Regions:
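Residue signature of alpha-solenoid helical repeat architecture, marking inter-repeat boundaries
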Residues: 4-5, 45
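Alpha-helical junction/boundary sensor with strong preference for TPR arrays
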Residues: 37-40, 44
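Alpha-helical linker/edge segments of TPR/alpha-solenoid repeat scaffolds
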Residues: 52-64
Length: 64
């Protein structure tokens, strides 16, 4: 599986986990996606997208 495809699947998995009420699992998926993007040297726009989702989770944690 190509790295970009795997990263996208991890992002979607994280999104689905948020909808299921599993923010901790979502964070794990996003972190794995970000790490893979960095390893592959493709963390530009994908990295920014993942970091935005992680920041949203952090904001939800501080609100709750």
């Amino acid at each position: 599986m190509q790295a970009q495809e795997r990263i996208r699947k991890l992002i979607v998995l994280g999104d689905n986990r948020i909808e299921q009420g599993l923010p901790g699992k979502a964070r794990e998926s996003y972190a794995e996606a970000l790490e893979l993007a960095r390893e592959e040297g493709i963390d530009g726009s994908l990295g920014a997208l993942i970091q935005l989702r992680l920041a949203d989770l952090d904001a939800q944690d501080s609100d709750g």
